[in-house]
């Protein structure tokens, strides 16, 4: 029993192995058959194309050459044999090479040369009977315009070459002229078709050239962008121009002077009671802020000197009080009507406070002090000098007397004299 089981196992193993080998060998054979079939098809196709092209060339060559006698019979038999071969091995139309790409054409000289799409279209146009039988395509006006400029006599040499070199044109010419069309109509239609073909080819070349130019110009655009980027400064390199400051000429604005180079400011001349109302009116009009700019402030050094001069004057006044007669009592401040009141004693400390307020315009003091002395020459007139002076008195009603104004002006003169003495001592 054990031996029978071993034999059965060996049989089943052998059968499985044989079946696996058979399946693998079958697949390998199928692959080999498929490869051989593809190889034979490729070789057959290439051979058939070559034989057909060669047979066509030889046949056309034999047909163009004229001969007689026994040689003609031999050539005819050979031509028929080659025709049978070309018909047998010629591939089907769906397997032919596209004529727009490349076409093997047989020339009268017996050589095969590749034709481009233009030559292939020209060959098909020459061998098409519709080219010569039908009316030209397109508007008749265009054909008439072309015909008016076309001269058939100038094409005699080209016509002879076409009849000798192209068997298809020669055969069609022999059949159609003069049975179907006249000699002039035959060639007019042919050359007009060639003219249309040339125009179409020119349009294609122009489109192709434009496409090539657009492709070639793309890197140029990138180069121009790079050049522009090189010309335009980057944000880091770009610098903001500084704002130009308007400067005034030295004539308009005086240069700063040192304290030793400063000249004393002369006080404005005092207005005497004998001055006419016209002169006072002129001064008030000049001092009017609506007509003239504000008075410039006095420099700090001058105010300091005035303050020092006031201190010296105060000390001198104290000395005079001890030794000489006392200073005359200051009069009462001016009233709005411009009349001075009775005497009123003032402490000397008022002079110090007055000196600290010196940087105001002295012309205002002059106008206030002289406003009561001016005679109203323009009474009742709007905008007269007295009205202006009264307005100024209301606006700037300072608690000062004429004596104090005189003292302030004398202090300015004294400071100028002291400065001159200092200059002489320094020299």
Curated annotation (Swiss-Prot):
Residue ranges annotated as compositionally biased, kind Pro residues, are: 324-333
Pfam families, sorted: BSD (PF03909)
Compositional bias of type Acidic residues: which residue ranges? Answer: 219-229, 388-397
Q: Which residues carry this modification: Phosphothreonine?
A: 353
Supply the SUPFAM superfamilies for this chain. Answer: BSD domain-like
Q: Which Gene3D superfamilies match?
A: BSD domain
Q: Which residues form the BSD domain?
A: 146-198
Q: What InterPro entries has UniProt attached to this entry?
A: BSD_dom, BSD_dom_sf, BSD_domain-containing
Which segments show compositional bias classed as Basic and acidic residues?
236-245, 347-364
The segments labelled Disordered in the record are 208-397
Ranges in coiled-coil conformation: none
PROSITE patterns on file: BSD
Q: Does the keyword S-adenosyl-L-methionine apply?
A: no
Alphabetically ordered keywords of this record: Phosphoprotein
Q: Which residues carry this modification: Phosphoserine?
A: 92, 166, 384-385, 415
Q: List all Polar residues biased stretches.
A: 368-387
Question: Does this entry carry the keyword ATP-binding?
Answer: no
> From start to end residue, where is composition biased (Low complexity)?
268-279
Protein name, please?
BSD domain-containing protein 1
Which organism was this protein described from? Mus musculus
Q: What is the lineage of its organism?
A: Eukaryota, Metazoa, Chordata, Craniata, Vertebrata
Gene this chain is encoded by: Bsdc1
């Amino acid at each position: 029993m054990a031996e029978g089981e071993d034999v059965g196992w060996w049989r089943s193993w052998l059968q499985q192995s044989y079946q696996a080998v058979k399946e693998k060998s079958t697949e390998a054979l199928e692959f080999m058959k498929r490869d051989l079939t593809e190889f034979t098809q490729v070789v057959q196709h290439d051979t058939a194309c070559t034989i057909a092209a060669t047979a066509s060339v030889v046949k056309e060559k034999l047909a163009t050459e004229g001969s007689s006698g026994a040689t003609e019979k031999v050539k005819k038999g050979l031509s028929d044999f080659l025709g049978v071969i070309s018909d047998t091995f010629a591939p089907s139309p769906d397997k032919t090479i596209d004529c727009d790409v490349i076409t093997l054409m047989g020339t009268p000289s017996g050589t095969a040369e590749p034709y481009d799409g233009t030559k292939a279209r020209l060959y098909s146009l020459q061998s098409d009977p519709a080219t010569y039988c039908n009316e030209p395509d397109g508007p008749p006006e265009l054909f008439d315009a072309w015909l008016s400029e076309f001269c058939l006599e100038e094409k005699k040499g080209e016509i002879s070459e076409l009849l000798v070199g192209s068997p298809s044109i020669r055969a069609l010419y022999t059949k159609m002229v003069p049975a179907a069309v006249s000699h002039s109509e035959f060639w007019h239609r042919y050359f007009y078709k060639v003219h249309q073909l040339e125009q179409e080819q020119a349009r294609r070349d122009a489109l192709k050239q434009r496409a090539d130019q657009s492709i070639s110009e793309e890197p140029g655009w990138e180069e121009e962008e790079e050049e522009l980027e090189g010309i335009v400064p980057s944000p880091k390199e770009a610098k903001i121009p500084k704002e130009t400051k308007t400067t005034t000429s030295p004539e308009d604005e005086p240069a700063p002077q040192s304290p030793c180079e400063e000249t004393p400011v002369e006080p404005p001349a005092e207005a005497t009671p004998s001055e006419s109302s016209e002169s006072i009116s002129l001064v008030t009009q000049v001092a009017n802020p609506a007509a003239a700019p504000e008075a410039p402030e006095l420099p700090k050094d001058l105010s300091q000197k005035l303050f020092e001069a006031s201190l010296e004057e105060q000390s001198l006044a104290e000395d005079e009080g001890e030794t000489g007669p006392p200073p005359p009592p200051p009069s009462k401040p001016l009233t709005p009507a411009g009349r001075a009141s009775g005497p009123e004693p003032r402490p000397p400390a008022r002079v110090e406070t007055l000196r600290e307020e010196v940087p105001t315009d002295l012309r205002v003091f002059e106008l206030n002090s002289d406003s009561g002395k001016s005679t109203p020459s323009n009474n009742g007139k709007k905008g007269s000098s007295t009205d202006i002076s009264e307005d100024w008195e209301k606006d700037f009603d300072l608690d000062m007397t004429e004596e104090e104004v005189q003292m302030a002006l004398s202090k300015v003169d004294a400071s100028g004299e002291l400065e001159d003495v200092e200059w002489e001592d320094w020299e």
